[in-house]
Amino acid sequence: MKKILFLSLFLMVCTILSAQKRVKVACVGNSITYGYTLPNPATDSYPSQLQQLLGETYEVGNFGKSGATLLNKGHRPYMQQEEFKKAIAFAGDIVVIHLGINDTDPRDWPNYRDSFVKDYLALIDSFRVANPKCHIIIARLTPIADRHPRFESGTRDWHGEIQQSIETIAKYAGVQLMDFHEPLYPYPYLLPDAVHPNVEGAGILAKTVYSAITGDFGGLHLSELYTDNMVLQHGEPLAIRGKANAGEKVTVSIAKQKLTAKAASNGDWAVTIQPLKAGGPYTLTVSAGKQKQTFNNVLAGEVWLCSGQSNMEFYLSWSKTAKRDIPQAANDQIRLFDMKARWRTDAVEWDTSVLDSLNHLQYYKDTEWTVCS
């Protein structure tokens, strides 16, 4: 009996300690944070999806208020809402703020724009008072699509002005800046009503916040343009850039040059190599942590970008002199990165799978640099 009682008490203490160790994340915002227009905000909103990504060691609170403005003289000031009071009481260890979309309303920004920075700083200070050790992340605004009824009557321009203000606030307040705009901007279908993300869009926001909190950006990543047989521009300083987990040391080596960089809080890193002498072949290596990517048979030379219409796709094998010309084409000093369309733009109906791929910007087939032959 004593053993059972001791075990029960032990498990109870472990449970309490476990609960105390959970990192609290307060998601502060408007209807986009709340999950307005989603089938089930309780499971589909970005804070709910963020909870799934972070796991049981985190507790994510959704304090989104539909229609809320950042401006304290706006038509629905966030700091006057019940959600704000609950967010303060929550005293999050991490506070994620996405406000400003509703401030593009003609009732707000034209009249009270000069108070935006002051009011945002006051909001930040409120959370710092509630938890002096909290880490605050503020987000650049999600896009507003051109289908919005007020897009060309001020909303587009005011949206841009607010973005600039948010960037200024991040620097002045010493808080982490996160981008909610770039991940959604290329995909209009993610914003069915021009403002609110669908479930997939909310998932992208959740992943963005997850990376901002954990620094996990999926490890070392470079553009698809980096492959074996590639050509780098010779004779001038050249930037090599990519993604890595935040804070990770990245090392780039080529032609007896070895450069290092530290991935920023958004995962971006870049180094600038000194001008390469024309020729090669060179070997380019990029490493971060336990990951390493090696690109062989790299040349330094002239890089030409060619784009155009159907005549750019004309195959040499289609020409009348193909049999004579093709044998003369072999030249290992010439390389081609040929991006071929996945689907023809002929007068045919595409099925839904094609439309889905196009919506995800999958226009071209996977390719790599090849040696001319």
Name each region found by the language model.
Residues D228, E236-I240:
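Structural beta-strand segments of beta-rich domains
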Residues S357-S373:
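A conserved hydrophobic secondary-structure block that centers on an alpha-helix together
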Residues F217-L222:
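Proline/serine/threonine-rich low-complexity linkers at boundaries of modular beta-sandwich domains
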Residues Q20-K21, Q52, Y78-D216:
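Alpha-helical cap/lid subdomain in secreted, periplasmic
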Residues P327-R344, V348-L361:
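C-terminal catalytic domains of large/alpha subunits in multi-subunit enzymes
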Residues K21-C27, I32-L121, D157, L276, ...:
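Conserved SGNH/GDSL esterase-like catalytic core that processes O-acyl groups on lipids
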Residues R241-T321:
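Extended acidic/polar, glycine-enriched regions
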Residues M1-K21:
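Bacterial Sec-dependent N-terminal signal peptides
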